[in-house]
Amino acid sequence: MSRPTVAVVDLKSLRSNFALAQSLAPGANAIPMVKANAYGHGMIEVSRALAESAPAFGVASIDEALTLRQAGIQQPILLLEGTFSCDEVAIAADNNFMLMVENLVQNDAIVNASISQPIIVWLGIDTGMHRLGFQPKEAIQAYQALKNSDNVAKPIIAASHFACADDMGSSATSAQLAIFDQWIKSQTLASGDIIKQSLANSAAILAWPKTHRDWQRPGYMLYGNSPFSEEQDNADKLIPVMSLQSAVISIRCISSGESVGYTANWTAKRDSTIATITVGYGDGYPRHAPNGTPVLINGVRCPLVGRVSMDMITVDVTDLDLVSIGDKVVLWGPELPVNEIAHHCGTIGYELLTRMPSRVPRIYIN
């Protein structure tokens, strides 16, 4: 019998979340972001599940894109960070990869490449995140060079990324949008070109309808998790796709004053019943999860107690009416959002999902 720690991935919920993204911006193309192994959910399986409805897919690197091609995914694939070397441009052309262009080195590599067919190019414009992309003035020169190149398919897509779209109280998104729109307006007037546009990440899809342009880029929301720290009407419709599950493997009674686990960082204040669960930081469960982090056992919330080990955690089940070895445990999932666990741990759900190691089997349902 295999170890009972598994990540159950509900593909029906995945498709529902993607349909929500499409419905919120019906005039736009929605590109599922499947980078980082589809946020830990399994890039190939997720892409196959969405292949009938997705016009393209988004990844971080050419290695991820080639993995999808080798798995039989036929849609265009967007490389969000573009190419890292000149030889990747020819590989991109041969495989119908779309390239984000973030700097003049990447721009020149495309313009000067010897390739089999023109490439669809996304011109990254830095409107305020200050991480990647051309400054607006530099983007004019880059756009003109791309426009004049036979290596570039037309129209070119202008793109930017929001820094604070998940903060509804921030003025940063409106400021970035204004900079982007001014660039589009001036470039359209100067060139007469039709410039396709992409702005909306998950938070913008859910809450900033003015950002819904030709292409949108659902990521975190695709996997059923809200990018917001507070409630948001559209985000509340999302269904978590992954359920990290395990089982009770030991039950023991300890006396008041006895401690549990490495460093003895939790001491019972009463006679207690402790259940040991076969999951730990070797399975992606956060080592820094503090005492009191909720764990579901037989559908009931119970507090984590003691240090998280590589392969095990311990949970106080004193208040459970009945618990037995083999009982089902949920670490996060639809009944216990990964965002809640992340909040207890001082991190974000994105990190917990993407750090899920390969030793945890993914089980795909629906």
Place the predicted regions along the sequence by residue.
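Active-site anion/phosphate-binding pocket segments in diverse small-molecule metabolic enzymes
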Residues: 2-11, 15-18, 64, 83-86, ...
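Active-site-proximal beta-alpha core segment in soluble small-molecule metabolic enzymes
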Residues: 6-9, 13-16, 26-198
